[in-house]
Amino acid sequence: MGVRKLKPVTNGTRHAILYDFSEITKKEPEKSLTEPLKKKAGRNNQGRITVRHKGGGHKRLYRIIDFKRDKWGVPAKVAAIEYDPNRSARIALLHYADGEKRYIIWPEGLKVGDTVVAGPDAEIKVGNALPLENIPVGTFIHNIELTPGKGGQLVRAAGMSAQILGRQGDYVQVRLPSGEIRLIHKKCMATVGTVGLAEHELIKLGKAGRARWLGIRPTVRGTAMNPVDHPHGGGEGKTFGKHPVSPWGQPTKGYKTRRGAKYSDKFIIKRRGK
């Protein structure tokens, strides 16, 4: 598991740092756990762009991931570690004792042949999933639920982990990767360990074409546009002479965009840093 730096044979390989895929043990996905993934190219049902810089890219199959970890008390053996084009992390294929197969996000240190289990009585071991009330203070966790039974929503990207800091009545204090300290209900599930592939932050694609293979389109500067397309557009020179804003006029570069009096404010003990 790691990265490889390409030799500067061409301009496209000069600065490229890519995965070596040494952690992958199985190339083809489990057919029963995949489904077609239709391309949206960042458009909604009206055909309008709702997410910029998306489009094209290689065809993908969606891998159905078990974010809920709701199969309590049934041990599962790690059968393979696979590539997933739909996320930065790798995924692990589990074979349960009753014959069922499921994918989970691959945590650092989990190997083929290891056994994992979910439930309140599970051991505090990498890959095991438990309610937050059963996980000791100081433990690093990932794939954290915000609502009991809804499935993990937080800390799912490569190399990420959160830490349990303490308990407060029916809630558990968790420090998230952003630095935010948040209260999460003690019945919410989380998986022990850190998401694998911490080297993801070292990756350099090296050329525009490699970004296009991933479905990432160019990011055009507002100052390079016409006035009809962006508040920074137009003019003879390079400067736009006003406070920087988004294409929709929202102030940017340090401006706080979270709306006030939000329901979840009472669960946030400390906001994330810059």
From Swiss-Prot:
Signal peptide: none annotated. GO terms for molecular function: rRNA binding; structural constituent of ribosome; transferase activity. It comes from the Bacteria. Residues 224-259 are annotated as: Disordered. Keywords: Ribonucleoprotein, Ribosomal protein, RNA-binding, rRNA-binding. InterPro entries: NA-bd_OB-fold, Rib_uL2_dom2, Ribosomal_uL2, Ribosomal_uL2_bac/org-type, Ribosomal_uL2_C, Ribosomal_uL2_CS, Ribosomal_uL2_dom3, Ribosomal_uL2_RNA-bd_dom. The keyword Ribosomal protein applies. One of its GO terms (cellular component) is large ribosomal subunit. The keyword Ribonucleoprotein applies. One of its GO terms (biological process) is cytoplasmic translation. It holds the Pfam family Ribosomal_L2. One of the primary rRNA binding proteins. Required for association of the 30S and 50S subunits to form the 70S ribosome, for tRNA binding and peptide bond formation. It has been suggested to have peptidyltransferase activity; this is somewhat controversial. Makes several contacts with the 16S rRNA in the 70S ribosome. Part of the 50S ribosomal subunit. Forms a bridge to the 30S subunit in the 70S ribosome. Belongs to the universal ribosomal protein uL2 family. NCBIfam families: rplB_bact (TIGR01171). This is Large ribosomal subunit protein uL2. The gene is rplB.
